Amino acid sequence: MQIQQLTGIGKRESNQDFICIDRLESGASFFLIADGMGGYEKGDDAARIVSENIFTFLNYVESVNEQNIQKAVQKANLAIKQFNIKNDIKSGATIGGVIVYKNTSHIFWVGDVMVYQINKDKVLFQTKSHTLVNSLLESNSIKEEKTLEKYKHIVTRSVSGKPCESNIGYHSTVFSQDNLFIICSDGVHNTISIEQFLLFLNQKNGIQELESKFLKNTQDNYSIITIGF
């Protein structure tokens, strides 16, 4: 397994993304990016709290599956609710993660952190972000995404203390040993297409080149995890 990670501040005053890479007691590999929500307070703390609570819960379950991942996110959601009440604030995070055990992957997300599964530069699967624009497209309320460009950052699900908004998206697959998983915050996928991303990854020092040419001057924080086999 080959792992790369990258995070940066962009043009923001602080980095409110949090990367968690660790191993569960079961032997599964755990990868997560939590993105503190813009417009809320203490996003860096929220991202850390969410990540730590999800990992801690899953570290002690007998098996990793959709139900237990949802329970882990609910635990994190409760922790954020308590944090918000204690500090009299609104805070929260969006998440995207991959848990790998043997040749099975569990992909999960809440909000607009995206996860891709790649095979030989072909996208086998990509998450569909929980955003207002996607909800309107699915309901046929709008025909073209560009008509709601200014609303693309509004998420419909998050880990922010509201149980009704923290339902995960989930995808599980048995993968081959030449697969690649990519997790990235919206500061990345709103800046560069997956096709451009893959072109850079195929080059020497690709992820660093990607940062220097595209990401350092973005308006948002940016975070990436790549997991290759």
Language-model features: locations:
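PP2C/PPM-type serine/threonine phosphatase catalytic domain
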Residues: M1-F229
